[in-house]
Amino acid sequence: MSTLKNTFFITPPDTPTQAGPENIFYDFNDGARVLLPEGKWHVRLLDADSENILFCCDVDKGWVTSSKKYFVRFRIQVFRQGEETPLLDETLKLKDRPVLISFPTGTLGDLLGWFPYAERFQSLHKCRLECTMSQDIIDLLAPQYPQIQFSTPDKPRTVAPYATYRVGLYFGGDTNNQPVDFRKVGFHRSAGYILGVDPREAPVRLDLSAPRVIQEPYVCIATQSTCQAKYWNNGTGWSEVIAHLKSLGYRVMCIDRDAHYGQGFVWNHIPWGAEDFTGKLPLQERVNLLRHASFFIGLPSGLSWLAWATRIPVVLISGFSLPNSEFYTPWRVFNSHGCYGCWDDTSLNFDHHDFLWCPRHKNTDRQFECTRLITGAQVNGVINKLHRSLTEQGVEATLKKGVSNE
């Protein structure tokens, strides 16, 4: 296996891994790839499902590769020029084949959103699947998915994969690495389209067996994110929410990794009144705490995805992304009375290097109004509905008596 080309994806092997006749090599590790020796060849790349010819050419020697890198049931045909019967005729067949899905090593939310599609892919094709990702997420997921091999990108175990797929966020209108722009379908569902499986969302499986430790009703919150546009930028919002939660009888625990986060002159701090449960802890410890929370309140960030996977209600506050950009929750908080949805606007490209990115209103009094216009009263209204629902189910009354809801 070749080394990392960048910090995101594993590059394909230098030579295709499958040997055909006449010293022809091919594989599906960067779309369909064929490496031809000296000769007079005619090559066709087809979509085996539609039987459309995607590309054909005459070539004397060298490479023929598809422009499409996502899952297509490719058919590769290699003819000697002038002959009607192909010397090589190979249709993609993944059953029992070594297959690699390369994920970026990046953020928690991306991986938790994407990974269920990898499991769906393995179940569909019955391939020998390896997935590469960061070690902390491997530690969280691997015990729940014994049929899949996990590794970090610098130490892949599959040395000669038959096929490789790279799941990530592709900007700039890229439709070679994804069949549809992720901003049109929601970033997590894009993985389903890249892998050619059912794009309906599903939470990852987690170990939810930890016993309840805190007997009082409590709510977990996460207020930090990776850029200012993702924050809840209402100045008094969190303090209003925390005060309201306490009036309802909840302890409020902030579980961000960082109590303080920002760049340059803009920094965000743990909200006053929340109990400080911040810190760089193993993800399983976060799961153990979330599992027994009455509910979670957060942003379009990784901890919201983690909370969703623990099967507790999630109040998700966002204006930076559209309501269908993340998993469905009936407790989503969104305000349509100002600017919103820049993340999902295909005419814009997110600038990962600009912490204060606000493409339509930066340096104006409308900057970050997508969440600034979401008031504490609006969020508290959603909390009231959720609290009433839990009370009607008898959940909160049981907890107030100090009895576990297990």
Swiss-Prot record:
A Pfam family assignment: Glyco_transf_9
Annotated ADP-D-glycero-beta-D-manno-heptose binding sites: T107, L108, G109, Q224, T226, K230, R257, L281, G302, E326
Membrane-spanning residues: none
Catalytic activity: ADP-D-glycero-beta-D-manno-heptose + L-seryl-[protein] = O-(D-glycero-alpha-D-manno-heptosyl)-L-seryl-[protein] + ADP + H(+)
Active site: residue positions: D110 (proton acceptor)
InterPro entries linked to this entry: Aah/TibC-like, Glyco_trans_9, TibC/BAHTCr-like_N
Its EC number(s): 2.4.99.-
Outcome of swapping C358R: Loss of glycosyltransferase activity
Known cofactor(s): Fe(3+)
Sequence positions that bind Fe(3+): C339, C342, C358, C370
Bound cofactor: record note: Binds 1 Fe(3+) cation per subunit.
Keyword annotations of the record: Glycosyltransferase, Iron, Metal-binding, Transferase
Consequence of changing P300S: Loss of ligand stereospecificity. Can use both ADP-D,D-heptose and ADP-L,D-heptose as sugar donor
Consequence the record notes for mutating D110A: Loss of catalytic activity
Bridged cysteine pairs (disulfide): none
GO molecular function: glycosyltransferase activity; metal ion binding
Function summary: Glycosylates adhesin TibA. Specifically adds anomer D-glycero-beta-D-manno-heptose. Cannot use ADP-L-glycero-beta-D-manno-heptose as a sugar donor.
Description of how the protein assembles with itself and partners: Homododecamer composed of 6 homodimers forming a ring.
Misc note: Able to functionally replace the autotransporter adhesin heptosyltransferase (AAH) of the AIDA system in fully restoring activity to the AIDA-I adhesin depending on the modification of AIDA-I with heptose residues.
Family to which the UniProt record says this protein belongs: Belongs to the glycosyltransferase 9 family.
This protein's name: Autotransporter heptosyltransferase TibC
Organism whose genome encodes this protein: Escherichia coli O78:H11 (strain H10407 / ETEC)
